Amino acid sequence: MTRSHEFADGIGATEGAAGVVERGVTNEAVSKRVPKRSRASAKKAGSSFERLIADHLAAVVDDRIDRRVKTGSQDRGDIGGLRHMGGRVVIEAKDYGGRLMPGPWIGEAETERGNDDALCGLVIAKRRGTTDPGDQFVLMTVNDLTALLTGNRDHINQEEK
């Protein structure tokens, strides 16, 4: 199902089944522009993106940050070694050719945060049009942002009681 949007500046946009919104571009144009990936090419793109982000964070933040080994259903995120205020931070890296799927990705990051007993989980998503690791998108819930800023998840545990 495709829905049309019009922004205040009069530029139209379409939203496709995946929830991707592009200003001034029809879904048909997007699907023609984004080539279909095979499973192998998708895995390669994902691995390359994880390496790009891990290397950037290791150079800028802490040299102990690196890609994690995949562990199946008990996955603890794509990038490990990142800590803030004594708590682990789980990073889920996503390269879907510039498409954003925040709901499922945030859910995956939350599952992996729980598996790792981490302070917060976040998603770093590939931004179309740039390969600069510092220009990629970061997605997280407000609860995870608050945990990151305060160094604990106490506010979340209190809300659940």
Which functions belong to the PLM regions below?
Residues 2-161:
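Catalytic phosphate/metal-binding cores of nucleic-acid and nucleotide-processing enzymes, i.e., regions
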